[in-house]
Amino acid sequence: MHIPELVAHRGYALHYPEKTLIGIEAAIRAGARFVEVDVQLSADKVPVLFHDRTLDRLCRAQGMIHRYTREQLKAFHVFEFERFGYKFAQNPITTLAELGALLARHPQVTAFIELKRVSIEVFGVQAVLDNVLRSLAPVLSQCVLISYNVPVLAAARKQGYHSVGAILERWHHQRNADVQAIHPDYLFCDAVDLPRFGDLEKAGAKVVVYEVTDPQVALKLAKRGVSLIETFAIGEMLAAFEPVRAQKA
């Protein structure tokens, strides 16, 4: 039985605010060897971890990341009121450099760094790429650049970046010429956008599927050729696979 690798999707998002240092640290403590985060640029082009286009859901604030400087963003906190109330009310927005420092302390961990389309739209491909690579300079060997935006991945390849992953809007987009031209190391797809049946394995690329919190679903996907599973419940999923790993051993 093939057991897929597990990716801490947005950190340990089941129990902590997503894309924050405390959630990523918790995921690593739980045993995560892979983490996934989203990156946007502040007004002064400092890369920070943030998923949404607006601040309201995560911070209960108005506006967008790229409208504020890094210094101004220090006034906001990522606490996800709808899920956690005020439990994490003082939890700051995490910079990409802070994630890099964490990765340096955990060389066994690989991070999938999603370059968000909103920042590429505002600042352009090269500005996003340059600032992200600068922030991650000490730990680039541990990082895979991923995006829905194929041109930014093509630019990374042109600069010699070692590992990229294309996020697909639909599974059949993996056949698109621009996707094939970058020879992605990883192909990401939402579980709901996969074909219901058939082999999902792709030569030359590892398939990563999100969002899965059911161990049996993960095992079925692995049987179809999926290499990695993204999950908000990293600790629970790792624990669920322990008996399977022991039986396999």
Feature annotation, model-predicted:
Residues M1-A249:
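Phosphate-group recognition and catalysis centered on beta-loop-alpha active-site segments
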